[in-house]
Design a protein with these regions (language model features):
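Substrate-binding clefts and substrate-entry loops adjacent to catalytic sites
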Residues: 89, 160-164
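Catalytic DNA-binding helix-loop module of base-excision-repair DNA glycosylases/AP lyases
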Residues: 44-49, 100, 104-106, 115-159, ...
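Alpha-helix N-cap/helix-start motif
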Residues: 58, 144-148, 166, 182
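N-terminal polyanion-binding entry modules of DNA glycosylases/AP lyases
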Residues: 2-121, 175-184, 188-218
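Short, charged low-complexity linear motifs
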Residues: 167-177
Length: 218
């Protein structure tokens, strides 16, 4: 019985990996808000600003912000009114302005101006929750898995999880995928979600991806 259960689980892992590759093939190449920055500080701040804001908006705003405040020391000393002017295009810019300034102060005061790379230390920073910490860590090469709306929706549709709570989805996906794939899941699923913005189109492709006959063509 145990052997049979193990075989079934291994098959689920293999199918899920093939599905992940299919999602990648059905996605456009695009820069995400957390990618292609010069420092861990810039990656973290852009990740904080990207919450509930389109990447196409976040990226140019972050570029403008980092031209004015290149590091944590400079942003920590910034006036909130000046930061608000710069990041106004992002959603909830007032709250985010306060958060990224306070976050920068914490980095300067508590971490010698170096962004911590430990999950438990990251979530102590203002504006950094579980998702933001995991997305940041996965971007810098850590074995982490950030669960956002794209990851939640797609993983439920494909049967990778039956849970709706992000932290439970994270646990399920970490069980289903080998550790070396954890930091690839979020960017692949986000790109797929951003490529197929129509819910009908997205669901149609996901139904095909879920079918065994389609999977076997990989």
């Amino acid at each position: 019985m145990i052997k049979k259960t193990l075989v079934v689980f291994i098959m689920r892992q293999e199918i899920a990996l093939k599905q992940l590759k299919l999602l990648s093939k059905n996605s456009k190449e695009m820069r995400l808000a957390v990618e292609n920055w010069k420092s861990n500080f810039q990656i973290l701040i852009s990740t904080i600003m990207s919450a509930r804001t389109r990447d196409e908006v976040t990226i140019p705003v972050a570029e403008k912000l980092f031209k004015k405040y290149q590091n944590s020391k400079k942003l920590a000393a910034a006036k909130i009114s000046e930061v608000e002017k710069v990041i106004k295009p992002v959603n909830f810019y007032r709250n985010k302005s306060r958060n990224i300034i306070e976050c920068s102060k914490q980095i300067v005061q508590n971490y010698n101006s170096n962004v911590p790379t430990d999950f438990n230390e990251l979530i102590k920073l203002k504006g950094v929750g579980r998702k933001t910490a995991n997305v940041f860590l996965s971007e810098i090469g850590g074995k982490a898995l950030g669960v956002d709306t794209h990851v939640s929706y797609i993983s439920q549709k494909l049967g990778w999880t039956k849970n709706k709570a992000p932290h439970k989805i994270e646990v399920d996906l970490k069980k289903l995928f080998a550790k070396r794939y954890w930091n690839r899941i979020n960017p692949i699923l986000v790109r797929f979600g951003k490529t197929h913005t129509s819910r009908r189109e997205k669901d149609k492709i996901l139904r095909e991806v879920k079918k065994e006959r389609f999977i076997n063509k990989c």
